[in-house]
Amino acid sequence: MTTDYKSPLRVGIGGPVGSGKTALLEKLCKAMRDDYHIAVVTNDIYTKEDQRILTEAQALEPERIVGVETGGCPHTAIREDASMNLAAVENLARKFGNLDVVFVESGGDNLSATFSPELADLTIYVIDVASGEKIPRKGGPGITKSDLLVINKIDLAPMVGADLGIMASDTNRMRGQKPWAFSNLRNDVEGLEKIIGFVVEEGMLVSHSEKAVSG
């Protein structure tokens, strides 16, 4: 089936409530928007709060940020019945025609949440240090099967008594060779470069400047 628009890379960003998914998405958009054509789909159960936050933060032009009200379990909207999100991604792809990547942020969910492969080409799962040192070893598909695991809010480790060394060891044990990154996205951009590098490399993205040189 042929289309008159480019099929973008779709990157799913999941994780529990308050882990820093929206903060990560804002940083990614602001860091990548000059080099790539980007759009975003956010998910909330009863509101479009994350869409509003990203719009007010001027992460992208407002028309590039679409909010989906799932009206139910966040997991269902990204896995069992992803139709609303699939439609939102397709509408954005049709509207802009040349999108390189669409980020799909799930509503806050538990460690068992995963994206349908029909919806996401790559998945990033975000947990945070404030939830406790033991989180990585609890496992669950988000921690063990996501393409990239992000352990956010490392600046809070001393305040909550979390040992980052133990968290790193547990993460390596749970994920094997799968990549992961520590991050501090509130007051710093620690870890952001590694996350962007993962998206660009694994998603085989080509920047505007690279296209200009090769073209």
Curated annotation (Swiss-Prot):
It holds the Pfam family cobW. GO terms for molecular function: GTP binding; GTPase activity; nickel cation binding. Keywords: Chaperone, Cytoplasm, GTP-binding, Nickel insertion, Nucleotide-binding. It is found in: Cytoplasm. GO terms for cellular component: cytoplasm. Its main location: cytoplasm. Facilitates the functional incorporation of the urease nickel metallocenter. This process requires GTP hydrolysis, probably effectuated by UreG. Belongs to the SIMIBI class G3E GTPase family. UreG subfamily. This is Urease accessory protein UreG. It comes from Alcanivorax borkumensis (strain ATCC 700651 / DSM 11573 / NCIMB 13689 / SK2). The lineage of its organism: Bacteria, Pseudomonadati, Pseudomonadota, Gammaproteobacteria, Oceanospirillales. The gene is ureG.
